[in-house]
């Protein structure tokens, strides 16, 4: 246990931020899962709309420091490529 008041406060803040960050990360993963499910179902329109929403959530998470910007770019790029491949198959 921390002995200084400032350290105790810092620990409380860390725990609070940890819960918030976990929630945000889980929310982003949910949006990514929606995109993946739409791609697997072969529904291009739904996948594109889901990707747009997921991209927004990912960008916000990157701004908050939950994901690095390169990670966000990589995820969006890979999902966009999969959606493009759906178009090519049709």
UniProtKB/Swiss-Prot annotation:
Function: Binds directly to 16S ribosomal RNA.
Region named Disordered: 1-25
GO biological process, one term: translation
Pfam families (UniProt xref): Ribosomal_S20p
Alphabetically ordered keywords of this record: Ribonucleoprotein, Ribosomal protein, RNA-binding, rRNA-binding
Similarity remark: Belongs to the bacterial ribosomal protein bS20 family.
Comp. bias intervals (Polar residues): 1-10
Gene Ontology molecular function: small ribosomal subunit rRNA binding; structural constituent of ribosome
Name of this chain's protein: Small ribosomal subunit protein bS20
Record's keyword annotation contains Iron: no
Organism: Orientia tsutsugamushi (strain Boryong)
One GO cellular component term: small ribosomal subunit
